[in-house]
Amino acid sequence: MGLTKGWAVLTDPPYGIGQDGGRGHRKSSGARVQAKKDWDRERPPAEVFAWLAAAPAGAIIWGGNYFADLLPPTMGWLYWQKLIGGDFSDGELAWTSRKGALKEFTYRKTNAEMVHPTQKPVALMEWCLGFLPDAKTILDPFMGSGTTLVACQRMGRHGTGIELDPDYFDVACRRVDEAARQPDLFVAPEPAPVQGGLEL
C-alpha cells in the first residue's frame, strides 16, 4: 500500500556503511546519544525504496548515491556542499523524484549539538522542503534525531516521523518540542483551535 495524495518523503536512511556512531555517548535526556549502535549495518530493502520513491507529492532521499541501484534514474539530484576539509566527504547527494537539473546547497555546519552521527543541518532540511511545495504532510520514516520534523515545525509544515531506536526517538521528540516553543518570526503560526457551540 502506497502513500495517499498529498504525502511526500524527506528522509536520510541508513547507508549500510557502518556509520552508526561509536563515541560512547549515551544521554537522551538532553545531550549526546552517539553510542555504539547497529542501525547502519545494512541498507533498507529494495521494496522500501520503491515505496518511498512513489510518494505522490515528491520524494527526497539523502545518501541517494548509496542506493542508486535501488532507485529509478533521476536528473533532479540535490547536492549539499559542506565546506569542510580533512578526511570527511566534501558533500552529500540526495536522490529526488523531481524534474530538473542538479541543485546545490552550500552550508557549513555550526557547532550545534550533534546527537546523531549522520545528523543533517536544520537549514538543509528547510531548503529541501522548498522542493516539495505540493506536500500536505512530510514523512520521514528514518527520523533519527528529528531534524526533518524540526524543519517542518519551523517552516509551518506538517511532518510525521518514524524511529525505531528509543534513544533517538526521545531526542527527536525533545527537539521538535523545543522548535514548537521557539516559532520562526517569519512563518505565520497555525490558528488556535476554536471550540464550536451547539445551537439548541
Feature map (PLM): residue ranges:
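Class I S-adenosyl-L-methionine-dependent methyltransferase catalytic core
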Residues: M1-L139, S145-L200
